[in-house]
Amino acid sequence: MNAKPGFTDYIVKDISLADFGRKELSLAETEMPGLMATREEFGPKQPLKGARIAGSLHMTIQTGVLIETLAALGADIRWVSCNIYSTQDHAAAAIAAAGIPVFAVKGETLTEYWDYTAKLFDWHGGGHPNMILDDGGDATMYVHLGLRAENGDTAFLDKPGSEEEEVFFALLKKQLKEKPKGYFAEIAKSIKGVSEETTTGVHRLYDMQKAGTLLWPAINVNDSVTKSKFDNLYGCRESLVDGIRRGTDVMMSGKVAMVAGFGDVGKGSAASLRQAGCRVMVSEVDPICALQAAMEGYEVVTMEDAAPRADIFVTATGNKDIITIEHMRAMKDRAIVCNIGHFDNEIQIAGLRNLKWTNIKPQVDEIEFPDKHRIIMLSEGRLVNLGNAMGHPSFVMSASFTNQTLAQIELFANNKDGKYKKEVYVLPKTLDEKVARLHLAKIGVKLTELRKDQADYIGVKQEGPYKSDHYRY
């Protein structure tokens, strides 16, 4: 299986992997009932006809099923991965072979990553996208910061705060020189909205809303219950240990593990390690989450306490500088360090660059300190479950991606009479319950049905929604 004759609008590692990718896409479809039901329900209506979706989300097999669902609903698509290590090359090849522009290679350089992101916005056939589907907010930030610089505020371009920002800001400077005047303004004007997949990207959206700089309506997919309480929790519960094992072949049972953060991702990560037989410690800044961790039986400590004690370290906070150089200096010889938050700045990777690095295998590095003690770093501090393993299972991603599809329909087809303003929204609970309902039969769940008198007694409709918006699941 090769690309369609004459179709060259893609960059993948090896297009000959497309057959392998297509077989795995077929397998994944069986495990993604929400997306398949969405195709069946909305396919004939073509609600995304005319949508030009710029997608920046891990180019995995599961994402391939999402892409083909969006296409089945009428959308035209361009796609990149939102992480330099998360692409599954056979998945990217299968999507390219189907004639969909995709620019994604496992192990991209940062320069390639941002060059590929820029390719999202120069549409095949001319023009620009009119929708963004984002994970982490990089595609959204590309337009917002590009427009800011185009409008004359360029001082920030000379003040990068990380290696990644150096590369990103260099690209923006290049674009300002090479693209026609008003390039970013045209893109910003053409886009109708963005749906955001993950916690980090959602924080960026709320920050822009607070500052009054958000350019379009946005739907926070992450805080749909059927995303955050399933993908973030149960997905991490399965994929974290998978990544650590594939990377290191270490015996988990009996090891001491430290998880920084006890939000949904941290909860899933701690459970993953406990189920593997680890003795798990947790650090937290939030007293509520700290109390939850303690009540679950975890030892709640600081990173300073854990550094000399733990064998395995996992960051899951969405914050920066959680594991510092000083922490790593205090760790045991060959302690394993990894991150399952979106960005690599949870671990002070930049401060390790002047030390001796020995690559063991792809996405596994041994770093030696001057005192000769070493640590094992997985995926250079980027997402361990996608860099060292295959990410979350298809079933749980079906729920997340069904939410993404519904969010794209809402913003593109249902934004009538100014329904959505330049603010951040969440999908209504009726859709959240619908997404859950679509996944029940696959795992043999039988719902109890409320009688009318029972529904009246608790003040809900028989068909739902069954909980108030402020209910905490």
UniProtKB/Swiss-Prot annotation:
It comes from Bradyrhizobium diazoefficiens (strain JCM 10833 / BCRC 13528 / IAM 13628 / NBRC 14792 / USDA 110). This is Adenosylhomocysteinase. Its main location: cytoplasm. GO terms for cellular component: cytosol. Substrate binds at residues 60, 135, 197, 227, 231. HAMAP family: AdoHcyase. PROSITE patterns: ADOHCYASE_1, ADOHCYASE_2. It holds the Pfam family AdoHcyase_NAD. Pathway: Amino-acid biosynthesis; L-homocysteine biosynthesis; L-homocysteine from S-adenosyl-L-homocysteine: step 1/1. Belongs to the adenosylhomocysteinase family. It catalyses: S-adenosyl-L-homocysteine + H2O = L-homocysteine + adenosine.
